[in-house]
């Protein structure tokens, strides 16, 4: 069975990447993909990690109300948006999930970055 990432690229009308799976969306949104046997994870850094603890708490509270999870990158320098899809997702579900993810990231960048 073809991987979910390849099926997503097909649905987007793109060729699968030969090296690091990365999509750059028109307004500077960089989506990195990590695929395992069970999930396809989409990750997008969207702003520097806030110095203010109240701002950080605000972002973490968003995790209770959205399918997109907010976290910090491995270096604790940026906030990242994460979204996971099961490998059993259809092309249509993958495309819908990708569009939801991009929409959420754009909203986060608009309102907070």
From Swiss-Prot:
> What is known about what this protein does?
Molecular chaperone required for SopB/SigD stabilization and secretion.
Keywords in alphabetical order, please. Answer: Chaperone, Cytoplasm, Virulence
Explain what induces or represses this protein's expression.
Answer: Transcriptionally regulated by InvF and SicA. Also regulated by SirA.
Origin, by domain of life?
Bacteria
| Coiled-coil region | none
Could you tell me the gene encoding this protein?
A: sigE
What's the name of the protein?
A: Chaperone protein SigE
Subunit details? Homodimer or higher-order oligomers.
Tagged with keyword Chaperone: yes
Q: Which SUPFAM superfamilies match?
A: Type III secretory system chaperone-like
Q: Which GO terms describe its cellular component?
A: cytoplasm
Q: Which family does it belong to?
A: Belongs to the IpgE/SigE chaperone family.
Localization, per the record, is:
Cytoplasm
Where is it mainly found?
Answer: cytoplasm
